């Protein structure tokens, strides 16, 4: 009986080791890269070619006494209206994050005058792609 338990344990362990584990990694995006969250930056161009997925997050670096990060609706985004935000992501440090928890479009802007100078970002968050199919290793010879 002891030998069969060892054999069963070995088979279960081998299965667990060989089973594919989906890679779940959130990505942190530094908004604007080394230019950060500042006026006169084309954030539409910055976002081009990037795929934002549920679980990712946007990291904003800015002068805390000059700028902020507000989420607004599409109409307010297009007109740079900031007096009725959906959410204020500013925490006061000038190093703030926007977690992307939902598959939807996020309209973000600076509500302290920077929006009219280009400080606005439209991000479409997608469902993460499925993990690649598991290919079992070739049998040992």
UniProtKB/Swiss-Prot annotation:
SUPFAM superfamilies for this protein: Cupredoxins (SSF49503)
Annotated S-S bridges: 80-115
A Gene Ontology molecular function term of the record: electron transfer activity
Residue span, Phytocyanin domain: 27-127
Alphabetically ordered keywords of this record: Disulfide bond, Glycoprotein, Signal
Cellular-component GO terms for this entry: apoplast
Record has rRNA-binding as a keyword: no
Signal peptide stretch: 1-26
Residues carrying a glycan: 42, 88
Pfam families noted in UniProt: Cu_bind_like
Record's function text: May act as a carbohydrate transporter.
Similarity section: Belongs to the early nodulin-like (ENODL) family.
Protein name in the entry: Early nodulin-like protein 19
Gene: ENODL19
């Amino acid at each position: 009986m002891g030998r069969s338990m060892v054999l069963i344990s070995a088979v279960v362990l081998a299965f667990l080791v060989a089973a594919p584990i989906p890679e779940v990694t959130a990505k942190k995006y530094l908004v604007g890269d080394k230019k950060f969250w500042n006026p006169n930056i084309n954030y539409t161009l910055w976002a081009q070619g990037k795929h934002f997925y549920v679980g990712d997050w946007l990291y904003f670096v800015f002068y805390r006494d000059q700028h902020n990060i507000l989420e607004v609706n599409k109409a307010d985004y297009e007109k740079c209206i900031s007096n009725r935000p959906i959410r204020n992501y500013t925490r006061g440090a000038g190093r703030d994050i926007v977690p992307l928890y939902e598959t939807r479009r996020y309209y973000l802007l600076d509500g302290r005058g920077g929006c009219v100078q280009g400080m606005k970002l439209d991000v479409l968050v997608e469902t993460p792609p499925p993990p690649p199919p598991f290919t079992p290793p070739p049998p040992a010879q």
